[in-house]
Amino acid sequence: MKNLKIVHTSDTHLGTDWKPELEKKAFRAILNGAIDLDADVVLIVGDVFDHARVADEVLQFFVQQIRTANIPVVVLPGNHDLYGEHSVYHREPFNDAPPNLYILSDNDGEIISFPELGLDVWGRAMLSHTPQFQPILGMPVKTADNWLVALAHGHYHFENDTEVRSSPIYPDEVANATCDYLALGHWERQVDVSNGRVKAFYSGSPLGALQTNENVSVIMAELNATTGVTAQQCWLPI
């Protein structure tokens, strides 16, 4: 298997009413940083957009930034940008989406393969944010020759968390997952929820819960055929 570098982010919330220009600068910094880090692919794990009513200008900005970056970008819809009949991803600006943009759009889960990288990316697009939606249900078995990276947008239940939550992810599900790396979204802060042999991380919002104006935070995951999978928080200048 090839050695890969993956930039993992989530919860960019483009189109928010709070500091919209800062959100754009942060998004641009993520893509520029991925290029500088020589990443092979960028993962955006849900809540790319703040809501389904964002202006077309915001969607056009997103599409243009992906096109300019010219690096594979995989998007998983989350609870703020659900993938259904009226999804933001069906709107006109996406009719001109660049070939390096990949959207996981199957509510039952799908694989997007990158043969040149030896990489399979899997995820379930969220149709509704309810306790019945299980973000990593149906994850496939990996093939011998490819890395399998899974994307999931939902709430991880620590052992003492017994409340009923929407889009739940449980420790035993992570421990028994078939993927090499589980890229998570939904939480604003970066959290390591690895379990067993599976590396699993929330990237957190790029601007963080405290909304800094100077840097963005992402996860840099490295998949190495000899040493295995590592992941660490990485700060990029805005």
Please name every model-derived segment.
Residues V7, D120-W122, I219:
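Conserved beta-strand elements of the Class I
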Residues K2, L117, T227-V229:
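Residue-level signal for beta-strand positions within conserved beta-sheet cores that form or flank
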Residues V42, L182, A231-C234:
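Generic beta-strand hydrophobic packing signal
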